[in-house]
């Protein structure tokens, strides 16, 4: 196994799957962190959670904008919904209120690592809009809790 080998570029169908999963994940994380920001269980982290929730909600919109609406890709969109390597991530946030901030850190770190790896599979020309979205999301998460 060549550790320095370049991964195969994404097909259109694979891109659809990636963007569906990222949109759904961003929505799920936004909803959870938004709930945390207003439930009063951890006042010290509520402002951070509200900020992250708003950003993740916007990221979901950006990912959704990357999903082609062609009827030819309906099967790929449907199959991708609720699946993927990131599908179990929201479950990692099933923690006590006092552990919320600590739980968010590795989840966002994992998302960032996933996006960096995904960017390596995208073409600088054909996938320029997706690469731009990844760069925007990464920049937006630069000040995430660590």
Question: Model-found features: residue ranges?
Answer:
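Helix-loop segments that flank and shape redox-cofactor active sites
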Residues: 28-54, 113-130
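All-alpha RGS (Regulator of G-protein Signaling) helical domain and cognate RGS-like helical scaffolds
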Residues: 19-25, 39-43, 100-107, 122-126
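Conserved alpha-helical segments that form or flank metal/cofactor-binding pockets of metalloenzymes
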Residues: 47-87
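Leu/Val/Ala/Ile-rich N-terminal alpha-helices, chiefly Sec-type signal peptides and the beginnings
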Residues: 1-30, 34-44
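Amphipathic alpha-helical assembly/interaction segments
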Residues: 5-8, 12-15, 45-46, 64, ...
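Acidic/His metal-coordination segments adjacent to aromatic residues that form catalytic metal sites
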Residues: 2-20, 78-107
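Amphipathic alpha-helical hairpins/coiled-coils and adjacent low-complexity
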Residues: 102-105, 109-145
């Amino acid at each position: 196994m060549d550790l320095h080998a370049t991964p195969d570029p994404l097909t259109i169908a694979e891109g659809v799957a990636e963007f569906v999963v990222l949109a759904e994940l961003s929505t799920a994380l936004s909803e959870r962190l938004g709930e945390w920001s207003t439930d009063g269980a951890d006042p010290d982290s509520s402002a951070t959670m509200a900020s992250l929730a708003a950003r993740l909600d916007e990221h979901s919109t950006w990912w959704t904008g990357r999903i082609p609406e062609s009827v030819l890709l309906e099967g790929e969109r449907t199959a991708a919904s609720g699946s993927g390597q990131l599908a179990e991530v929201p479950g990692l946030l099933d923690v006590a209120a006092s552990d919320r901030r600590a739980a968010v850190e590795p989840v966002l770190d994992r998302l960032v690592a996933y996006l960096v790896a995904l960017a390596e599979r995208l073409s600088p020309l054909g996938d320029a809009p997706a690469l731009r979205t990844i760069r925007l999301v990464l920049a937006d998460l630069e000040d995430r809790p660590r």
